[in-house]
């Protein structure tokens, strides 16, 4: 598997840069990293807070062949698993909060914005814009629960080393996707889900409730079971975690 890397000092958004690149390199994986993003995006209207040179910021593009639109969430699972696997070598207590955040206990260490292009019934390409909090010691935005590797371990970590670990892990999980091993990737994802056991607090348009995680469906919807035994299915942003 071939990977083409582009390194930038400063950019508005690595996702935007990669999406508008005129001539895409002929590689299985194309990735752009930046020391600083002036408009790094999170989900919706959110912005990813990052002190210059302190964190890992990258966008990764793949052009998979044969991944059906109905199973496109497997790509999100694979990338999230790769980020977690890299961080697993540096600390413990990590899990994946649906849909693709990496959590250390109840705090967010990494998040990803995904942009997918479709061609007919299949995925044409997919861009993962990821931020991983590495060496930042203080967060000033109103983000509710950020944490960095530096805050966890008490020491600085080489950012390029973390990046190499992510790419190495991604190659393994992405190879599973290309081989059609969607259920295998999904099983690995479910095994490390945040709140995968027990009853926890959530809220939706009808108010707050207690529920347990049942599964994440192929289409990426989260399935919860409330105290009455009723299954509730949610797309992203339709349910909130009460942390």
What are these language model-derived features?
Residues 1-89, 156, 231:
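N-terminal lobe of the biotin/lipoate ligase/transferase fold
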Residues 65-70, 74-94, 104-243:
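Long, positively charged amphipathic alpha-helical accessory segments at protein N-termini or as interdomain linkers
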């Amino acid at each position: 598997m071939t990977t083409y890397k582009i390194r930038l000092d400063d950019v508005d958004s690595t996702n935007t840069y990669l999406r508008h690149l005129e001539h895409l390199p002929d590689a299985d994986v194309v990735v752009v990293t930046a020391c600083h993003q002036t408009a790094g995006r999170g989900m919706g209207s959110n912005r990813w807070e990052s002190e210059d040179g302190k964190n890992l910021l990258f966008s990764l593009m793949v052009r998979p062949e044969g991944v059906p639109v109905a199973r496109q969430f497997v790509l999100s699972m694979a990338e999230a698993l790769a980020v977690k696997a890299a961080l697993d070598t540096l600390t413990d207590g990590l899990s994946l909060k649906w849909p693709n955040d990496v959590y250390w206990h109840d705090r967010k260490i990494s998040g990803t914005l995904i942009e997918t292009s479709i061609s007919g019934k299949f995925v044409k390409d997919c861009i993962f814009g990821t931020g991983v909090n590495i060496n930042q010691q203080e967060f000033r935005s109103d983000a509710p629960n950020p944490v960095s590797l530096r805050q966890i371990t008490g020491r600085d970590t080489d950012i390029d080393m973390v990046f190499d670990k992510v790419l190495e892990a991604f190659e393994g999980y992405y190879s599973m996707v290309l081989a059609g091993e969607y259920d295998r990737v999904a099983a690995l994802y479910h095994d490390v889900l945040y709140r995968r056991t027990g009853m926890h607090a959530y809220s939706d348009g009808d108010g707050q409730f207690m529920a347990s995680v049942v599964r994440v469906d192929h289409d990426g919807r989260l399935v919860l079971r409330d105290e009455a035994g009723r299954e509730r299915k949610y797309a992203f942003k339709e349910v909130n975690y009460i942390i």
